[in-house]
């Protein structure tokens, strides 16, 4: 298989995304984006068991330190972020060090935030090992940790020097996590590319069988969609990047109310996508057949299309207001005018939203 490359250029900070097989064995590639002689690999207990030793071997001629997190969203906290910084300082890492995030979205987010803050900013490389991280979390420079009040409330924008996606890491990904990652691919299609959505409908059976040929193609297309949006609006100033939050205002509230880790992020995103589509239909933006197609595709993946019955409408609405997409005390929701055409809207008031959440 030929390695595919997607080039990102954010504010004249270009970096590549590589997508291929056996990239974790490519010494030249993995050393190419390290400018100094120090690296620190951050991973979690689950991923480290599979991939840490081979990656350390690539950097055997470097000062190579490691930090291993427990596995789970509940560890994406200021406490563990501070522990990473302490390890960097105690091991005497300099400004030319490079952090390597080996893992899923939690590892990538907390490592990127540590890199953004250590000595006012050092390099880092994303090596995402989950489908969700490969198509979304590793691209675009958003780094953060959670706070009890809300998800990703404390963070920074800090672009990686490279994103290295080894498709072989998907072989060790549990089925539930693999399917959760599909939600972000569906989201990308809904935002910008109706043809891509149709391709997903036609190829989903092969994708769920982890066919690498099809997976490489859809990961590349999802990465291109995110690349184009991030290039145009790195820090959500113009509203373009906000489109990437389709379904996420609902999803982040669901995750927080259930307790981080009870639902995977992609599972909450799936329910959020359906809520956004249903609300779009209610406001006469999205036709019923398109809504049905979205529900059918997510159901085929075995992802949730309803928010949990244990959460009531008042709780969900209150939690949504802790989202970063609140401006001037109004929720800015991402809605759909069509498959492949998302828009930012502040035209949903609390009364309408509460009625929608209570009655659908």
Curated annotation (Swiss-Prot):
Record protein name field: 3-dehydroquinate synthase
Gene3D superfamilies named among the record's database cross-references: 3.40.50.1970, Dehydroquinate synthase-like - alpha domain
Keyword flag NAD: yes
Residue positions binding NAD(+): 71-76, 105-109, 129-130, 142, 151, 169-172
Pathway: Metabolic intermediate biosynthesis; chorismate biosynthesis; chorismate from D-erythrose 4-phosphate and phosphoenolpyruvate: step 2/7
Co-factor binding comment: Binds 1 divalent metal cation per subunit. Can use either Co(2+) or Zn(2+).
GO (cellular component) term, any one: cytoplasm
GO molecular function terms listed in the Swiss-Prot or TrEMBL record: 3-dehydroquinate synthase activity; metal ion binding; nucleotide binding
UniProt: Zn(2+) binding residues: 184, 248, 265
InterPro entries: Dehydroquinate_synthase, DHQ_synth_AroB, DHQ_synth_fam, DHQS/DOIS_N, DHQS_C
Functional description taken from the UniProt entry: Catalyzes the conversion of 3-deoxy-D-arabino-heptulosonate 7-phosphate (DAHP) to dehydroquinate (DHQ).
Keywords attached to this entry: Amino-acid biosynthesis, Aromatic amino acid biosynthesis, Cobalt, Cytoplasm, Lyase, Metal-binding, NAD, Nucleotide-binding, Zinc
Protein family per UniProt: Belongs to the sugar phosphate cyclases superfamily. Dehydroquinate synthase family.
Taxonomic lineage from the root: Bacteria, Pseudomonadati, Pseudomonadota, Gammaproteobacteria, Legionellales
